Structure formats: structure tokens, C-alpha cells
């Protein structure tokens, strides 16, 4: 055990040298985390062998030393990957490469330039929340490349861009639901204020009071370097109605009524002429059918026409049966022509249309209902882990899971945004049941959709 204590003391000396040197290069930070990993390995070995203290340092439980060793291994992997990028020669301090900084929002990213954001709810100085935003954010893509982007702040939160994707890592709306009574707040960044004023136009009679509200920024001093605020056009996410009806003048109303009267007269004349043409065509068609049915009746063949009754004699059993069959056929044809797929039913079926003899129209109506899917967006490892857990929990609801995939540019092979995963369902009912019990990991978003065929 003396050898174990000597090794532990040597590790402590090396750690103290790093702390006292104050070096800000990645090589030193990687060495720091490797020493921390070795320290936890010594703790784990000592605990397994019944040693409760190394020098003056108590030995932690096995689970604690194991978890900290895994954290150190993960940090070494991240730092070595960052060292291979174009940002490996930048200045990196112990604080910037600490586990707490990496895990703070946005998680699993390196950050520089912290800025305090104060959000005041209900215009009450006592009802205040403080958040930490970042001037520069270093995030890793799915192909292990690092990108450096600027951080931004608007009325809804703090965000950055992953390509064209706007990623919020702080959202004020959640805390507003907990601490605000009116649902309004102001954002203070240094001496700059972002707030949502009252509506810019008064609502018309009979309408609600929620109008189009714009978010203004009042600047008392220039923002810190590399940190920007963004003004937002609306307070709510849904776009408000921008144009309203104006009261018409008597002259305009009279002219409009005159035009409407002329249009009505024109439509009536057109419909009358069409009706006459249809009547004449229908009369000729009925006349031909009567002649055809009369000739069939005289030859004692079953009648299939609409006007199948003979003029001179009573209606026979075969004639009444054919007449009812004819009416049922015309009624079914009319219902199929009038029926169809409602707009909200398009894309609602999960099965491919079979090769039955239902006719072209029914096949088109069946094909209008497509399989429902859910699109997940997030880190590739998180999506894979979620798929593994979801298969055990929602095995009967989800029909298919896709592998993780990404979009690429139209002219380049660079991946755009985060990874994707598709979940396909048998019906909308099963998808709704899945949404009620779905628990996504942090940083994973979802949206609904339909496919033509699975």
C-alpha cells in the first residue's frame, strides 16, 4: 500500500504543477484530464482492496470513482478531437475545458465569452431570473468536425445557428409559465433591453385584443464584442392577421351591388341554357332507352334499362328485379362519384393499396391516404439510444424505425443540421398513443409527417 500512496502523491504533485503554471493550451488541458482519470483509477483500486484513505484523502465509493473516471475519459476524447480541428491552437483555460462548462447549456459544446442575461417578469424588479449566454459556441457535427458560431439573444431566449438551423439552448417561456402571472417579460443584456410593447394597432369590433405585437430593443450602450441581440417581429409564434376590412363608402357599395347583380343574372342565364341542353339530351337518351327496353320486352329478355316497363302490359317480376338492380347501380355510381377523400384525410393510410379489382377511382382514393410518420432531430448517439429504449417500451405502436441520417447540400456533400430518424406507424391512432407516452431525451425535437409508401 506504500507504493499506492506514493503513486497518488506523485499524481497530486503533477496536478498542482498544472494549476500553478496557468498554461492555456490544449496539450496542458488534455494532460490535466488524463491525470484526473489516473487519480480515479487509483481510488477505485484502493477501495476494491479495502483501503479507505490515501494519505489525508478519503477514498470515495466505487460508483463515484467509476463515474468520475468515465467523465474524464469522455473529456479526453472531446479535447483530442478539438485539438485536431482548426481551433486547437486557440487559448483554452481550465475553466473553459471543465466538465461543468461543457455540460452547461448548450450541452456537449465548448463555449467562450459568458454573458449574464437578466429576465424580468411582469415588470417586477423582484421577479428576476439570471441566465448565462455565450458569445462563441464550438459544436461538433455528426462527422466529428468542429464549427465555431456566435451566440445570439432575442425575446424568446438564447440561441445559435447550426448551419441554417436555429437552436435555442435557453428558452424564457418555460420559466415565464412558472414565475409570471401575465406571461410578459423583459430581457436585459448589459444595458440593452428587449421587450414586447402593447399591440401596434387597435383591434376591430368583435375581434380579440391580441394583435400584432413587435419586439423592440432599446440600447443604452453597444453590446459586448461577439454577442448580439435579435429583434423579433411578433410576440406570439403564430402570425397575426395583418389586414382588416375597411368600411365601404356608399358609392363603392352601390357599384359593388350593381356588379354582383349583373354577375348573378349572367350565371342564371348560363345555368338555364345548360339546363335546357341537359334536358334535351336527357329526353333523347330516355327516348332511346324506352325503344331499347320495348324491343327487349317483346323478345322476353330480362330488362336492364331504367325505363324498362312495357307500355301496354303490367310490370313483370323480371322487369321489377332489373329495375331495382338498375337503380342500385346508379345509386352506387352516384355515391362513388360524389364521395372522395377529405383534405384532412389525405396521407392517413399506412398500407399499400392492393391489386384488387376495385376500379381506378377507388384505387386513387385509397392511395390518397399515406402512412403517418414522426421525424426526430438530434444528436446521432441520442437518437440511437432512444430507438433502443423505444423498441422495448413501444414495441406494438411503432411499425418501423429508420437508421439515423442527415441532409446534405444541393451542391456539396456537407451534412446540414442535426441527424434525423423516422418512426412509421400503422395508423394515426397509434401515432397519437405514441405521442402521449413519448419521452424524448434533452436536445431532441420532433415533427409529424406522411409518406406515399413505406
UniProtKB/Swiss-Prot annotation:
Where does it reside? Answer: Host nucleus
- The region called DNA-binding domain is annotated at 370-454
Q: Does the keyword Transferase apply?
A: no
A single Gene Ontology CC annotation of this entry is: host cell nucleus
Which portions of the chain have biased composition (kind: Low complexity)? 313-323
Q: Keywords in UniProt for this one?
A: Activator, DNA replication, DNA-binding, Early protein, Host nucleus, Phosphoprotein, Repressor, Transcription, Transcription regulation
- Tell me the segments the record calls region Disordered: 197-355
Description of post-translational modifications: Phosphorylated.
Q: Which GO terms describe its biological process?
A: DNA replication; DNA-templated transcription; regulation of DNA replication; viral DNA genome replication
Stored Pfam families: PPV_E2_C (PF00511), PPV_E2_N (PF00508)
Query: Bias category Basic residues: which stretches?
Result: 234-247
**Top-level taxon of the source organism:** Viruses
Q: How does it assemble?
A: Binds DNA as homodimer. Interacts with protein E1; this interaction greatly increases E1 DNA-binding activity. Interacts with protein L1; this interaction enhances E2-dependent replication and transcription activation. Interacts with protein L2; this interaction inhibits E2 transcriptional activity but not DNA replication function E2. Interacts with protein E7; this interaction inhibits E7 oncogenic activity. Interacts with host TAF1; this interaction modulates E2-dependent transcriptional regulation. Interacts with host BRD4; this interaction mediates E2 transcriptional activation function.
The record ties this protein, via HAMAP family, to:
PPV_E2
Summarize the protein's role: Plays a role in the initiation of viral DNA replication. A dimer of E2 interacts with a dimer of E1 in order to improve specificity of E1 DNA binding activity. Once the complex recognizes and binds DNA at specific sites, the E2 dimer is removed from DNA. E2 also regulates viral transcription through binding to the E2RE response element (5'-ACCNNNNNNGGT-3') present in multiple copies in the regulatory regions of the viral genome. Activates or represses transcription depending on E2RE's position with regards to proximal promoter elements including the TATA-box.
Q: What is this protein called?
A: Regulatory protein E2
Give the species: Human papillomavirus 37
Amino acid at each position: 500500500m506504500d507504493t499506492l500512496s506514493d503513486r497518488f502523491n506523485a499524481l497530486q504533485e503533477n496536478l498542482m504543477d498544472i494549476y500553478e503554471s496557468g498554461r492555456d493550451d490544449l496539450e496542458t488541458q488534455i494532460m490535466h484530464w488524463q491525470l484526473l482519470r489516473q487519480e480515479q483509477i487509483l481510488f477505485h483500486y484502493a477501495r476494491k482492496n479495502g483501503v479507505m484513505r490515501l494519505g489525508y484523502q478519503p477514498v470515495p465509493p466505487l460508483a463515484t470513482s467509476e463515474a468520475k473516471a468515465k467523465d474524464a475519459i469522455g473529456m479526453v476524447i472531446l479535447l483530442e478531437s478539438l485539438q485536431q480541428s482548426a481551433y486547437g491552437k486557440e487559448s483554452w483555460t481550465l475553466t473553459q475545458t471543465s466538465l461543468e462548462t461543457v455540460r452547461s447549456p448548450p450541452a456537449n459544446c465548448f463555449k467562450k465569452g459568458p454573458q449574464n442575461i437578466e429576465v424580468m417578469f411582469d415588470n417586477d424588479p423582484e421577479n428576476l431570473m439570471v441566465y448565462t449566454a455565450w458569445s462563441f459556441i464550438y459544436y461538433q457535427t455528426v462527422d466529428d468536425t468542429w464549427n465555431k458560431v456566435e451566440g445570439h439573444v432575442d425575446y424568446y431566449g438564447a440561441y445559435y445557428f447550426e448551419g441554417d438551423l436555429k437552436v435555442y439552448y435557453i428558452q424564457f417561456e418555460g420559466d415565464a409559465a412558472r414565475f409570471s402571472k401575465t406571461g410578459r417579460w423583459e430581457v436585459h443584456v448589459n444595458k440593452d433591453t428587449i421587450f414586447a410593447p402593447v399591440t401596434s394597432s387597435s383591434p376591430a369590433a368583435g375581434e380579440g385584443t391580441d394583435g400584432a405585437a413587435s419586439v423592440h430593443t432599446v440600447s443604452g450602450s453597444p453590446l459586448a464584442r461577439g454577442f448580439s441581440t435579435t429583434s423579433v417581429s411578433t410576440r406570439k409564434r403564430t402570425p397575426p392577421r395583418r389586414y382588416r376590412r375597411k368600411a365601404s363608402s356608399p358609392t363603392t357599395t352601390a357599384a359593388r351591388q350593381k356588379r354582383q347583380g349583373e354577375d348573378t343574372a349572367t350565371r342564371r342565364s348560363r345555368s338555364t341554357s345548360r339546363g335546357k341542353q341537359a334536358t334535351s339530351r336527357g329526353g333523347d337518351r330516355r327516348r332511346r332507352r324506352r325503344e331499347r327496353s320495348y324491343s327487349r320486352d317483346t323478345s322476353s329478355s330480362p330488362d336492364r334499362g331504367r325505363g324498362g316497363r312495357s307500355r301496354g302490359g303490367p310490370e313483370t317480376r323480371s322487369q321489377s328485379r332489373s329495375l331495382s338492380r338498375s337503380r342500385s347501380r346508379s345509386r352506387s355510381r352516384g355515391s362513388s362519384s360524389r364521395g372522395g377523400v377529405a383534405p384532412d384525410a389525405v396521407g392517413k393510410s399506412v398500407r399499400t393499396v392492393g391489386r384488387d379489382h376495385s376500379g381506378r377511382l377507388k384505387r386513387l382514393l385509397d392511395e390518397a391516404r399515406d402512412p403517418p410518420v414522426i421525424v426526430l432531430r438530434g444528436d446521432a448517439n441520442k437518437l440511437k439510444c432512444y430507438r433502443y429504449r423505444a423498441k422495448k417500451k413501444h414495441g406494438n405502436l411503432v411499425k418501423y424505425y429508420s437508421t439515423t441520417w442527415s441532409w446534405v447540400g444541393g451542391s456539396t456533400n456537407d451534412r446540414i443540421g442535426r441527424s434525423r430518424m423516422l418512426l412509421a406507424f400503422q395508423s394515426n391512432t397509434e401515432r397519437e398513443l405514441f405521442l402521449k407516452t413519448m419521452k424524448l431525451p434533452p436536445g431532441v425535437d420532433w415533427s409529424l409527417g406522411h409518406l406515399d409508401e413505406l
